[in-house]
């Protein structure tokens, strides 16, 4: 099941209870979507099954998201070994664009401030998902594509290019030449290899 359109019976910041075809659904949500009782809404769903080893029970929970991108990020997060659904939900309490930017720019310090995420988990999130979300940052920075091509032509590998894109800060108000940006990127890559 990808999404569900249902009538809201109860809603708060953690749970939505909805009815569809005379069946009640309890859906865990990351934040208060301000859903109105007795109104219809659509949530993108993910069913998570966990096994209770000592009781041989399978427990299924439904997680719901307002946007498909939130659902995709949730799936990406729980694919990481030390991140479970509760931690992923805590991460998604923040604005999705803020989280994607943090992953793309490897802002481990910010991610580590989120409840349930320690420094090690934040590093894992950045290391395993950075490649997926680096392009989102590139779309916001028009110079990033030119920088990527320039560094690739100079023989730098993909990891160095991704690192440079996340580290180079450009004031878009000023008219800066791409060669200056490439120069800054090369300095950042050099500093990285010195450490």
UniProtKB/Swiss-Prot annotation:
Entry-linked InterPro entries: RuvA (IPR000085), RuvA_2-like (IPR010994), RuvA_C (IPR011114)
Quote the subcellular location field of this record.
Cytoplasm
Q: Name one Pfam family in it.
A: RuvA_C
> Region (Domain III): which ranges?
141-195
One of the GO biological process terms? DNA repair
In this chain, the stretch annotated as Domain II covers: 67-141
Checking SUPFAM superfamilies in the record gives:
RuvA domain 2-like
Which molecular function terms from Gene Ontology are attached? ATP binding; four-way junction DNA binding; four-way junction helicase activity
Q: Which UniProt keywords apply?
A: Cytoplasm, DNA damage, DNA recombination, DNA repair, DNA-binding
Q: Where is the signal peptide?
A: none
Q: Which Gene3D superfamilies match?
A: 5' to 3' exonuclease, C-terminal subdomain (1.10.150.20)
Keyword Cytoplasm: yes or no? yes
Keyword match Nucleotide-binding = no
Q: Where is this region: Flexible linker?
A: 141
Region described as Domain I: spans on this chain: 1-66
Q: Which domain of life is it from?
A: Bacteria
User: What GO CC terms are in its UniProt record?
Assistant: cytoplasm; Holliday junction helicase complex; Holliday junction resolvase complex
Q: What does this protein do?
A: The RuvA-RuvB-RuvC complex processes Holliday junction (HJ) DNA during genetic recombination and DNA repair, while the RuvA-RuvB complex plays an important role in the rescue of blocked DNA replication forks via replication fork reversal (RFR). RuvA specifically binds to HJ cruciform DNA, conferring on it an open structure. The RuvB hexamer acts as an ATP-dependent pump, pulling dsDNA into and through the RuvAB complex. HJ branch migration allows RuvC to scan DNA until it finds its consensus sequence, where it cleaves and resolves the cruciform DNA.
Tell me which family the UniProt entry assigns to this protein. Belongs to the RuvA family.
Q: How does it assemble?
A: Homotetramer. Forms an RuvA(8)-RuvB(12)-Holliday junction (HJ) complex. HJ DNA is sandwiched between 2 RuvA tetramers; dsDNA enters through RuvA and exits via RuvB. An RuvB hexamer assembles on each DNA strand where it exits the tetramer. Each RuvB hexamer is contacted by two RuvA subunits (via domain III) on 2 adjacent RuvB subunits; this complex drives branch migration. In the full resolvosome a probable DNA-RuvA(4)-RuvB(12)-RuvC(2) complex forms which resolves the HJ.
The record's comment about this protein's domains reads:
Has three domains with a flexible linker between the domains II and III and assumes an 'L' shape. Domain III is highly mobile and contacts RuvB.
Record-given protein name: Holliday junction branch migration complex subunit RuvA
**Biological source species:** Ureaplasma urealyticum serovar 10 (strain ATCC 33699 / Western)
